[in-house]
């Protein structure tokens, strides 16, 4: 998509958990969210999965962390399995991630800093619904577009194309010199 739009795009997944997201997921799985035990267990599992994700990100990089997150999501999506640290370790091993290395990273002080930075970013963009997509240009203060809900690549492509056209149209009307369109600077966008 980035090549097609001639954009430099950086993608950052932030695994967030909100009370609304927990309840919606529990309803989807036919779990009772009205008991504090179920909510506490769900919250603990979410925090544990989030910690593993960030530890993998620190130790192995974002690409490996995304693979872990997707594999975890896939294994839990049918509702047949419940989250446990043992499941997380099993999935890490299947991705050639050494649980021992992750265990030491989980104790590292920088883990809390990385999580705090992403939480700050989520607060900055006022993310309240999950999943959400934030598109912003890091070179322009106060830029950004918040999209709630699941989006396909085609949806994002259409948004980028329509946004680019609507942003550039007034510029094209100001000048008859079409090459101005092609010299428009390429933004560095972040997709959260």
Regions found by a protein language model. Give the residues of each.
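C-terminal cap of thioredoxin/glutaredoxin-like
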Residues: 1-3, 79-192
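Structural alpha/beta surface segment adjacent to cysteine/selenocysteine redox centers
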Residues: 1-79
């Amino acid at each position: 998509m980035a090549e097609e739009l001639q954009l430099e795009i950086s993608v950052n997944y932030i695994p967030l958990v909100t009370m609304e997201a927990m309840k919606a997921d529990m309803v989807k799985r036919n779990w009772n969210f009205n008991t504090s035990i179920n909510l506490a267990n769900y919250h603990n599992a979410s925090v544990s999965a989030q910690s593993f994700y960030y530890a993998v990100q620190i130790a192995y990089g974002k690409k490996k962390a995304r693979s872990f997150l997707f594999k975890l999501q896939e294994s839990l999506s049918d509702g047949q399995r419940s989250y446990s640290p043992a499941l997380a370790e099993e999935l890490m091993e299947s991705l050639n991630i050494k649980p021992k290395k992750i265990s030491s990273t989980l104790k590292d002080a920088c883990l809390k800093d990385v999580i705090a930075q992403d939480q700050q970013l989520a607060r900055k963009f006022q993310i309240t619904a999950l999943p959400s997509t934030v598109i912003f240009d890091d070179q322009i203060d106060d830029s950004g577009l918040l999209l709630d809900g699941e989006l396909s690549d085609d949806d994002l492509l259409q948004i980028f194309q329509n946004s680019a056209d609507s942003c550039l149209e007034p510029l094209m009307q100001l000048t008859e010199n079409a090459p101005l369109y092609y010299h428009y600077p390429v933004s560095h966008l972040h997709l959260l």
